[in-house]
């Protein structure tokens, strides 16, 4: 019988030398010198090797933790301004991963989680800060939109789906996922509709806050290995969310009025009160920097939820000068990205200073912050990017203020020193 198993003569059945299955029981049988191995055994060996690599890799990842100064320097490379927020984030993130490295309590002192709440206007860099931190630490990162979340059992996305997305980002490696960062955007949109608890269910407001509580604080979430609930017999993955850093962000429109109302209570009215002039009035950013937990409760976040986000950082509204810097200075600046695209066609792209200022001015007037810069630049260069692959001899394209304002098309410079306005201007 043993001779038959390894006999490759025609008419004889071949068997896997490892599991003993015949060639008819498996999809593929791979031959070696006097031995055979089936596809199932190969897959099993791969799984064993992958598991061993998983056990080793987290230890390697944890060897060197960047200091707050190093984290801040990395943020400076990609994010313009927001100095205070960068410092707060760098310290909070450093403390979080220091806590993970020293997980055994010393003298019975257990370190709490330092989840973060970012408050700032649209396009001020909240998402970019969180994403850049995850990249600098080489940890998995995922984003969720709070407005799409609902309580379990209601139509919408369950909060547990956030962990599912994080697992997908690291190929369902639970150890890696547990060291990841989750950014939940539009968190202000799940504030409850009034200060008074309602007898009706608020499934997309307070209900979601309640559902997020345990996840953010730390619980063991059961997640299906490949998503969905189609296979009840599948063994669920157990993910400890106490090791995951949660960063929540929102614009919190109108919060400054709540803060001002609190600040002005007891400031005096009548003839003896001091009247503040226009110059004495704080900007929205300055007012938001004075936020207190009570203000967030009045805004509509429940006290328990605020308690799970002990680190609060406020971001300032970007001015025109900051937007000009964002366009050209960061490592991943928009102008550098479009330069790279044009270089692939053998064309140099030049943005003149007046063009950068005009783009920034347009973004300011649209009130979109840095988020609106890409759509403006894309609109300016669309026709040129459409035409250049079909035009021979172009070596340079120049964008100035008139191009941004729609008065002319980018200037194209040819190899023979001929200058011509790009198509679109007759």
From Swiss-Prot:
UniProt-annotated binding residues for Zn(2+): 16, 19, 38, 41
Key word Chaperone present: yes
Listed SMART domains: AAA (SM00382), ClpB_D2-small (SM01086), zf-C4_ClpX (SM00994)
Keyword field: ATP-binding, Chaperone, Metal-binding, Nucleotide-binding, Zinc
Binding-site residues, ATP: 121-128
InterPro entries hit by this protein: AAA+_ATPase, ATP-dep_Clp_protease_ClpX, ATPase_AAA_core, Clp_ATPase_C, Clp_protease_ATP-bd_su_ClpX, ClpX_bact, P-loop_NTPase, Znf_CppX_C4
GO CC, alphabetical: HslUV protease complex
CDD domains for this protein: RecA-like_ClpX
Any GO MF annotation of the entry: ATP-dependent protein folding chaperone
UniProt keyword Hydrolase, yes or no: no
Any Gene Ontology biological process: proteolysis involved in protein catabolic process
Residues annotated as domain ClpX-type ZB: 4-57
Entries under Pfam families matching the protein: AAA_2, ClpB_D2-small, zf-C4_ClpX
Its job: ATP-dependent specificity component of the Clp protease. It directs the protease to specific substrates. Can perform chaperone functions in the absence of ClpP.
Recorded family membership: Belongs to the ClpX chaperone family.
PANTHER family hit by this protein: ATP-DEPENDENT CLP PROTEASE ATP-BINDING SUBUNIT CLPX-LIKE, MITOCHONDRIAL, ATP-DEPENDENT CLP PROTEASE ATP-BINDING SUBUNIT CLPX-LIKE, MITOCHONDRIAL-RELATED
Subunit comment: Component of the ClpX-ClpP complex. Forms a hexameric ring that, in the presence of ATP, binds to fourteen ClpP subunits assembled into a disk-like structure with a central cavity, resembling the structure of eukaryotic proteasomes.
Protein name according to UniProt: ATP-dependent Clp protease ATP-binding subunit ClpX
Organism of provenance: Shewanella oneidensis (strain ATCC 700550 / JCM 31522 / CIP 106686 / LMG 19005 / NCIMB 14063 / MR-1)
């Amino acid at each position: 019988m043993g001779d038959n198993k390894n006999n490759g003569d025609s008419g004889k059945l071949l068997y896997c030398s490892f599991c003993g299955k015949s060639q008819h029981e498996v999809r593929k049988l791979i031959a070696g010198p006097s031995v055979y191995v089936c596809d199932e055994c190969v897959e099993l060996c791969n799984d064993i090797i992958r598991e061993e690599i998983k056990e080793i890799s987290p230890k390697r990842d944890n060897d060197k933790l960047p200091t707050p100064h190093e984290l801040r320097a990395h943020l400076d490379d990609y994010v313009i301004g927001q100095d205070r927020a960068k410092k707060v984030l760098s310290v909070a993130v450093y403390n979080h991963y220091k806590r993970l490295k020293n997980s055994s309590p010393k003298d019975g002192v257990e370190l709490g989680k330092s989840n973060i709440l970012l408050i700032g206007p649209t396009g001020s860099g909240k998402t970019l800060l969180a994403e850049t931190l995850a990249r600098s630490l080489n940890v998995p990162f995922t984003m969720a939109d709070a407005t799409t979340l609902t309580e379990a059992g209601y139509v919408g996305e369950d909060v547990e789906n956030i962990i599912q997305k994080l697992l997908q980002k690291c190929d369902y490696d639970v150890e890696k996922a547990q060291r990841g960062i989750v950014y939940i955007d539009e968190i202000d949109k799940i504030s409850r509709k009034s200060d008074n608890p309602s007898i009706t269910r608020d499934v997309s407001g307070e209900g979601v806050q309640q559902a997020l509580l345990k996840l953010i604080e730390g619980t063991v979430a059961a997640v299906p290995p490949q998503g969905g609930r189609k296979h009840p017999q599948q063994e669920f993955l157990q993910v400890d969310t106490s090791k995951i850093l949660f960063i929540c962000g929102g614009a919190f429109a109108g919060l400054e009025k709540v803060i001002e109302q609190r600040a002005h209570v007891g400031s005096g009215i009548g003839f003896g009160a001091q009247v503040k002039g226009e110059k004495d009035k704080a900007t929205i950013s300055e007012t938001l920097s004075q936020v207190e937990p009570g203000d967030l409760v009045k805004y509509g976040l429940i006290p328990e939820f605020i308690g799970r986000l002990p680190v609060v950082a406020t971001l300032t509204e970007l001015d025109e000068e900051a937007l000009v810097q964002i366009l050209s200075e960061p490592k991943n600046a928009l102008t550098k990205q479009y330069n790279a695209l044009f270089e692939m066609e053998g064309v140099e792209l030049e943005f003149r200073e007046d063009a950068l200022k005009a783009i920034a001015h347009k973004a300011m007037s649209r009130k979109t912050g840095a988020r609106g810069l890409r759509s403006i630049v894309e609109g300016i260069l669309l026709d040129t990017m459409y035409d250049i692959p079909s035009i021979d001899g172009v070596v340079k394209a120049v964008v100035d203020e008139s191009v941004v304002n729609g008065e002319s098309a980018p200037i194209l410079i040819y190899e023979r020193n001929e200058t011509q306005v790009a198509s679109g201007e007759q």
